[in-house]
């Protein structure tokens, strides 16, 4: 029973994380449209932030 609850919890956090990812992608597209000169720099920064956000929950769970 405990395992099922934990699995359900993981599914919820995954769906929230994917929603956040879509928001970030939309934001990145808008930003790169407005500032095409800095698009590479913005993409690099966003990818770095996204990777940090993705790794953070797993890091916290491991600790």
Swiss-Prot record:
This is Lysis protein. Induces the formation of specific membrane adhesion sites between the inner and outer membranes, apparently leading to host cell lysis. Lysis may be performed via activation of host murein hydrolases. One of its GO terms (biological process) is killing of cells of another organism. Belongs to the Leviviricetes lysis protein family. GO terms for cellular component: host cell plasma membrane; membrane. The chain crosses the membrane at residues 21-43. It is found in: Host cell inner membrane; Host cell outer membrane. The keyword Transmembrane helix applies.
């Amino acid at each position: 029973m405990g395992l099922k609850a934990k699995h359900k919890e993981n599914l919820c956090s995954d769906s929230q994380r994917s929603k956040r990812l879509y928001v970030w992608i939309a934001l990145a597209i808008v930003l790169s449209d407005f500032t095409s000169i800095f698009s590479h720099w913005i993409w690099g920064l966003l990818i770095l932030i996204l990777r940090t956000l993705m790794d953070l929950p797993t890091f916290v769970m491991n600790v």
